[in-house]
Structure formats: structure tokens, C-alpha cells
């Protein structure tokens, strides 16, 4: 976790070919790694002063890259070429051979996942494709300070079919914290934020966690799909338990219930889960097969509220199953 994270990998004066005139012009080029502020990219400024004051500049996003290579000296001295999968390319020339090697090395490491020993020895890494794919499945986020955690800052988020993980930005193998999806009370997003509320069953306890990110919509959709799958699994389990209860009632045998899946007590789960509960299934034995609705707190006792609804955080429901935050929470 890095609270003072710097996304600049390399910067300096280079010469870039003008598309209109076809000549090389000197400019200040900044290479930034992926972060909560944006994807991997090259930012071109007229000079170093313009970069310092963040004046008008051109941005080239570095995704779908096919190869990064050095051009022959006969073509252009000290030149580096970035080749994309659509067969387009971006070429720039450095002021020295050492600078060109530095630019090429950093671009290969960040964009292609190439390690230093791969460049020097030329040995293929059979696990590189899998590692790169896993890295691509992580989202760059900035965890805002919260009283529930003693860490904050730049990190990466991974969403699996069961959990949300935060990983260290500098060491991708260091796991910082984990939240089970089934323990989330609610979640929401906008163009620059993703936020969720955790329940008591999480390691962090109850709390509101807010992440600054440019990928809020993608994170939301992935969390939404995973929680829908959990709800469908819970639905199938409840149906199996009902069928088992009906069969055992007809045979007048004691019923053995399997362990059910815990789900959050929230409006989101209210929409996508059944209202049947273990208590309702027991009622099938003595009161026929009619079902009676139970309150959400009775259905999921582990998530019984400790405070009134008026004391809950002021979260406004969205038109979907998530929610959007009022401006007072974001600030």
C-alpha cells in the first residue's frame, strides 16, 4: 500500500515524428504506469515547464501492445518503436543510446511484463502469460482513509467469485485485506468512485470503504455478476432443502438440513433472493406446505440490525440493485 504513490516511471526530452509534417520534433515525454488516476500512458508536453504546470498535452494510452523494439541505426539513431496489435506504431528518438535503452527497458517491463533476465538472456517464461493475465484482472484503485483500517493509498483490487482482495501496488504477491462478497451489505459506483459497506462477518468489521478509480463501472459490474451467482446458488440450495423437507415429511422421518449460505441483510439481496428460510422449511412438517413471509432479520439472524434504520448511513438507493452516494459522503 502506497499513500505517496508516484505513477511516473520515466520522463525526459525525446524527438517524436510529426504525423502531419513527417519530421522529428523535440518534446518532453512522460511515461506513467497504470494507477487509480488512469491506465498506462505516454503524455507529451512542449517542454518540462509545461509538464510541471500540467498544461495542454497529448495522451497515448498504452494497451493492446504487440511489441516494443529498438529501430536500426540506419533508420533512426537512438530510436524506440511501440507497435500495437492494429499494426499502428509510435516512434520516438532519444538523445543518447543509454537513454534509448532505458526507455525500452521500462516500457517492456511495464507494458509487456518482461523481466530483466528475460531481456538479457532471451529465455521464454512459460508462466508469463498466466501472470500477465492475472495482472490484467486486477483494477488500480486508491483506498481512501477509513477508521476501520490502518492502511490507505494506492493498491490493486481483485474480484473473484467469492471475495474482494486488495494487493500491494509494489509487490503483487502481498495481500493486504479481503472481504467476502456474501458479507457485503451494499455497494455502488460512479465515474470516479467505487464504494461498498461491509458487515460484521468481515475481518474489518462493519464499515464504509471508498476507492478512487477510473474503473468504477467495470468493478461494479464484476462484483454485481459475482453476487448474482452467489444468490442463484443460494436459491438452488433453498429449493433442494424444500424438496427434501417435503419428501421427509411424507415419510415421517426427521429432517436433516444442510448448512445454508449466509447472505447480507440489504435491499439488494431482498430483490434477488427468496423469502423462504430454514424456519419456514421446518413449518412444512406441522403446518402443511403454505409459506409465511418472515422479516429479513429473522431470515438471516447473523445480520440482525443493531440500530434502527434511521441510524444507518445516509445511502440513497439507485435504480439498480446497488446504490449511489450523496455528495456529502464523497466529500
Swiss-Prot record:
PTMs per UniProt: On Ret activation, phosphorylated on one or more C-terminal tyrosine residues by an Src family kinase.
Transmembrane segments: none
Claim: Cytoplasm is one of the keywords in the record: no
IRS-type PTB domain mapped to chain residues: 132-237
Organism superkingdom: Eukaryota
Domain comment quoted from the record: PTB domain mediates receptor interaction.
Biological function: DOK proteins are enzymatically inert adaptor or scaffolding proteins. They provide a docking platform for the assembly of multimolecular signaling complexes. DOK6 promotes Ret-mediated neurite growth. May have a role in brain development and/or maintenance.
Name of the protein in question: Docking protein 6
Amino acid at each position: 500500500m502506497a499513500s505517496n504513490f508516484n505513477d511516473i516511471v520515466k520522463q525526459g526530452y525525446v524527438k517524436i515524428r510529426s504525423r502531419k509534417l513527417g519530421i522529428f520534433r523535440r518534446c518532453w515525454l512522460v511515461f506513467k504506469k497504470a494507477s487509480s488516476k488512469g491506465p498506462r500512458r505516454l503524455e507529451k508536453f512542449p517542454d518540462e515547464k509545461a509538464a510541471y504546470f500540467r498544461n495542454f498535452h497529448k495522451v497515448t494510452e498504452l494497451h493492446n501492445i504487440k511489441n516494443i523494439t529498438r529501430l536500426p541505426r540506419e533508420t533512426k539513431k537512438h530510436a524506440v518503436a511501440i507497435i500495437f496489435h492494429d499494426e499502428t506504431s509510435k516512434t520516438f528518438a532519444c538523445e543518447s543510446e543509454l537513454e534509448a535503452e532505458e526507455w525500452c527497458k521500462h516500457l517492456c517491463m511495464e507494458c509487456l511484463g518482461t523481466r530483466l533476465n528475460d531481456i538479457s538472456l532471451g529465455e521464454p517464461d512459460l508462466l508469463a502469460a498466466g501472470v500477465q493475465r492475472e495482472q490484467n484482472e486486477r483494477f488500480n484503485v486508491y483506498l481512501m482513509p477509513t477508521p476501520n483500517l490502518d492502511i490507505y493509498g494506492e493498491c490493486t483490487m481483485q474480484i473473484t467469485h467469492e471475495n474482494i482482495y486488495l494487493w500491494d501496488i509494489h509487490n503483487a504477491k502481498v495481500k493486504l485485506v479481503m472481504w467476502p462478497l456474501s458479507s457485503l451489505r451494499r455497494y455502488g459506483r460512479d465515474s470516479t468512485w467505487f464504494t461498498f459497506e461491509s458487515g460484521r462477518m468481515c475481518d474489518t468489521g462493519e464499515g464504509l470503504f471508498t476507492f478512487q478509480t477510473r474503473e468504477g463501472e467495470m468493478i461494479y459490474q464484476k462484483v454485481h455478476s459475482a453476487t448474482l451467482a452467489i444468490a442463484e446458488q443460494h436459491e438452488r440450495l433453498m429449493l433442494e432443502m424444500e424438496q427434501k423437507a417435503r419428501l421427509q415429511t411424507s415419510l415421517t422421518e426427521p429432517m436433516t438440513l444442510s448448512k445454508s449460505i449466509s447472505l447480507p441483510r440489504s435491499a439488494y439481496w431482498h430483490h434477488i433472493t427468496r423469502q423462504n428460510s430454514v424456519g419456514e422449511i421446518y413449518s412444512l412438517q406441522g403446518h402443511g406446505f403454505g409459506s409465511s413471509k418472515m422479516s429479513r432479520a429473522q431470515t438471516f439472524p447473523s445480520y440482525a440490525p443493531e440500530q434502527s434504520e434511521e441510524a444507518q448511513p445516509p445511502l440513497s438507493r439507485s435504480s439498480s440493485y446497488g446504490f449511489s452516494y450523496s455528495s456529502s459522503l464523497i466529500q
